[in-house]
């Protein structure tokens, strides 16, 4: 019975990860298309970089892009961050279920290195943290 629970958990988390990834890619494509369609306008504030008029579902939208925050921020602001967050969180959950849950099957080759499952998991997490830290430090020192 526990095997079925494990398999269903993997399948559900895998689909959540796929759907979150598709949402993230979709919103990224939307903003690429939005940036490419921006046009300058005479009636725009000086802080604005451009505007794009769009139509969807019978409604018209006037999108204005600011390169810096406008002087007066709206009370409610829509953040497009949860697509990326949910992809990352579901990916970590999937990695934990598939690889860390079955570390002896996927992560350990006794002919190469005789380690326990816990050691394999900590080596993996240590590698992820090291690569992430190195990547962040490289971007802090580089100039864009």
Where are these regions (language model features)?
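Long, highly hydrophobic alpha-helical transmembrane signal-anchor segments
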Residues: 1-24
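Interfacial loop-to-helix junctions that mark the boundaries of transmembrane helices
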Residues: 112-119
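Transmembrane-helix bundle segments that line or gate the permeation/cavity pathway
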Residues: 24, 28-31, 35-39, 89, ...
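Membrane-interface amphipathic/juxtamembrane segments adjacent to transmembrane helices
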Residues: 28-71
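Membrane-helix interface motif
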Residues: 96-109
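Structural signature of hydrophobic alpha-helical transmembrane segments
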Residues: 119-125
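Conserved small/polar residues in nucleotide/adenosyl-binding loops
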Residues: 134-141
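Loop-to-transmembrane boundary segments
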Residues: 68-90
